[in-house]
Amino acid sequence: MSLDLALDVQYATASDYLPSEEQFSLWVKTAIGNSMEQAELTIRIVDARESQMLNSTYRGKDKPTNVLSFPFEAPPEIELPLLGDLVICAAVVENEAREQDKILEAHWAHMVVHGCLHLLGYDHIEDEEAEEMESLETQLIESLGFTDPYKEQ
């Protein structure tokens, strides 16, 4: 079974390197895997100002962040393939990759996989949940040909 994906990528900022829609599509399909037959998802690439505003509004943290996940929650009687939205801050992803000595493309892939897992209901608030989510992220990222994102460089 292959995922029927309707992906809308919105580039709301410019940068030296932004992944292509094809890369985003591959990363989303890898993260979602066989958990859904159809999925609709928006990925919005933003600057630090927009990320900070959204992070402040929805999480109470007045600073930009790497990825925000906004799951779509339909009433139980309505079945829709709408998974939700990811908002990714290009500047934060670039800074983190540089500071953590990670390959920029690998860090982008990790942020997309991480965000998609949140949209699928995974979380990392409790230690046990965090271990499960990180283990799955590592498997998915390694399946894309990148190294373990949680391994110390």
UniProtKB/Swiss-Prot annotation:
InterPro entries per record: MetalPrtase_cat_dom_sf_prd (IPR023091), YbeY (IPR002036), YbeY_CS (IPR020549)
Annotated GO biological process: rRNA processing
Class of this enzyme: hydrolase
Co-factor requirement: Zn(2+)
Broad class of where this protein is predominantly found: cytoplasm
Keyword field: Cytoplasm, Endonuclease, Hydrolase, Metal-binding, Nuclease, Ribosome biogenesis, rRNA processing, Zinc
Function, in words: Single strand-specific metallo-endoribonuclease involved in late-stage 70S ribosome quality control and in maturation of the 3' terminus of the 16S rRNA.
UniProt name for this protein: Endoribonuclease YbeY
Species per Swiss-Prot/TrEMBL record: Shewanella sp. (strain MR-7)
Gene (UniProt): ybeY
